[in-house]
């Protein structure tokens, strides 16, 4: 949807080479970029165009590159361009066709602070927060930050270091205690992030307290699980609700915080509100006894209501329609302050991004990508030695790249990037293409930060850059690293 002059601005112009860079986006053009033969690209295009119900779906990997925002949008264009949306068997191009369906809601709490930052930008808000604005850092709810972050509360997470880009940069910022003055970490295990805490509080695990979990991301069913405690919390471990209630009591605000309710009272209230809306859920006493309630859902078809009646069922875009050309993005591109190489465009375009495969150098000739490991959920369970034994933390390297470096499976190798260095066991395999290496994300960082900083734990974020993506200001570098490998 475009109200401005469309000359040389349409998606068709970009694809056909009659606008923008005047380069026709043929299969031959795409082949060296993708590493896929032109004939195979043409066959895929023909198959998509001929399919009665093409189900086009992307995971969350493509967006986690420095050029991933445009890649993600381009994938969503495929079903749009052939008109195969809102029909049985089709999809929107996203991973989830529809929002998740939860049987139970959350606490009725509204944050009185409306100013917010992209979560990936938190360390910059510590280092130079007052320089961050809506146009250079994606600040929302205000034109700029008026203060640097001075206090950090990290609950049940490992993103101070381990799960955040460029660990060495983060460490250097945190080492200056005139910047971030106080760190509170509240967790069940001693993560690398927990090592930076001024105060470390031991939390009760979910299995050590009454808890409720919801499952809503499946297309075919939704569920709620109530249970616990399976065992008593050891030592001084306590639930966060009870601790916060005691803190509120010290300020004379316990009644305002708890509203006279225990943790179970709140969980019961939330459950019963969901049960009332659902109409078929068990009573509170019944769900506590049976533990799980699962309900089958009708299969969702993405954008089916919009296709049926686009006037009655407009989308949440400014125009209410599918926007191949975005006036909103055009305005952002014209007004935001972008780093050299950053691209925001009103249509999806190909851009190599920064530290992409086209950025390799003689010093860093390999492209490195992260991926999820089967023994961990991000960094959760990364401290369990039995899991490490059966599913080792290994770098994937193609035989051609390994042979030229004298590397065999089982060798310990040094991996260097502009951001840092790790040690990791090599796995030589043809399952990864030449010129590219893969490192499972989530391994626990283990380095002498007062010494050589070489990470013996092989955390991929020792190698990543901190620079965020152009639009969302998010974690694009997770799969965009340039590196070199040598036998250690």
Q: Where do the PLM segments sit?
A:
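Extended redox/cofactor-interaction regions of prokaryotic respiratory oxidoreductases
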Residues: 77-196, 204-212, 230, 288, ...
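Phosphate/diphosphate-binding loops
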Residues: 169-172, 178-182, 188-191, 223, ...
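Conserved short loop/turn motifs at secondary-structure junctions
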Residues: 29-33, 59-66, 98-100, 158-160
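Flexible glycine/proline-enriched surface loops and loop-helix/loop-strand junctions
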Residues: 7-11, 24-28, 57-62, 155, ...
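Glycine-rich phosphate/diphosphate-binding loops that line cofactor/substrate pockets in enzymes
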Residues: 20-22, 42-55, 138-151, 357
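Long, contiguous, secondary-structure-rich segments that constitute the structural scaffold
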Residues: 238-290, 379-381, 385-396, 400-488
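Long, well-ordered, tryptophan-enriched scaffold segments
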Residues: 4-51
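Catalytic or ion-translocation cores adjacent to nucleophile or general acid/base/metal-coordination motifs
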Residues: 204-229, 236, 434-436
């Amino acid at each position: 949807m475009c109200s401005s002059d469309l000359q040389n601005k349409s998606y068709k112009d970009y694809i056909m080479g009659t606008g923008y860079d005047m380069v026709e986006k043929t299969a031959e053009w795409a082949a060296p970029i993708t590493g896929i033969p032109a004939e195979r690209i043409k066959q895929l295009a023909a198959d998509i165009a001929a399919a009665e119900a093409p189900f086009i779906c992307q995971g969350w990997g493509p967006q986690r590159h420095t050029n991933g925002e445009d890649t993600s949008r381009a994938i969503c264009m495929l079903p749009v361009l052939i008109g195969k949306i809102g029909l049985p068997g089709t999809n929107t191009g996203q991973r989830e066709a529809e929002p998740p369906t939860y049987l139970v809601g959350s606490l009725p709490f509204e944050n009185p602070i409306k100013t917010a930052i992209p979560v990936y930008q938190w360390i910059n808000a510590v280092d130079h927060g007052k320089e961050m604005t809506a146009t250079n850092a994606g600040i929302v709810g205000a034109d700029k930050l008026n203060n640097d972050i001075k206090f950090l509360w990290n609950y049940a997470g490992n993103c101070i270091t381990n799960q955040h880009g460029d660990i060495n940069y983060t460490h250097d910022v945190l080492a200056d205690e005139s910047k971030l003055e106080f760190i509170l970490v509240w967790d069940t295990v001693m993560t690398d992030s927990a090592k930076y805490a001024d105060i470390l509080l031991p939390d009760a695990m979910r299995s050590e307290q009454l808890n409720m979990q919801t499952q809503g991301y499946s297309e075919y069913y939704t569920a709620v699980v109530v249970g616990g405690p399976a065992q008593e919390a050891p030592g001084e471990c306590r639930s966060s609700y009870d601790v916060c209630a005691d803190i509120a009591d010290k300020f004379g605000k316990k009644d305002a915080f708890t509203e006279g309710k225990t943790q179970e009272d709140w969980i019961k209230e939330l459950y019963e509100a969901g049960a009332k809306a659902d109409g078929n859920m068990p009573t509170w006493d019944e769900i506590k006894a049976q533990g799980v309630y699962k309900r089958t859902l009708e299969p969702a078809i993405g954008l089916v209501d919009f296709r049926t009646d686009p006037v009655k069922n407009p989308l949440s875009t400014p125009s209410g329609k599918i926007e191949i050309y975005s006036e909103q993005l055009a305005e952002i591109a014209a007004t935001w302050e972008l780093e050299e190489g950053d691209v925001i465009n009103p249509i999806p375009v190909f851009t190599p991004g920064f530290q992409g495969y086209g950025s390799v150098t003689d010093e860093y000739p390999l492209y490195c990508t992260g991926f999820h490991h089967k023994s961990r959920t991000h960094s959760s369970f990364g401290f369990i030695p039995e899991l490490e034994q059966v599913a080792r933390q290994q770098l994937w390297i193609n035989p051609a790249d390994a042979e030229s470096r004298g590397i065999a499976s089982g060798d310990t190798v040094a991996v260097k990037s502009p951001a840092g260095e790790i040690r990791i066991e090599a796995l030589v395999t043809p399952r990864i293409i030449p010129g590219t290496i893969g490192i499972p994300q989530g391994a626990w960082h283990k380095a002498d930060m007062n010494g050589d900083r070489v990470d013996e734990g092989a955390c991929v974020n020792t190698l990543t850059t901190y620079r965020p993506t152009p639009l969302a200001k998010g974690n694009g570098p997770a799969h965009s690293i340039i590196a070199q490998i040598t036998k250690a």
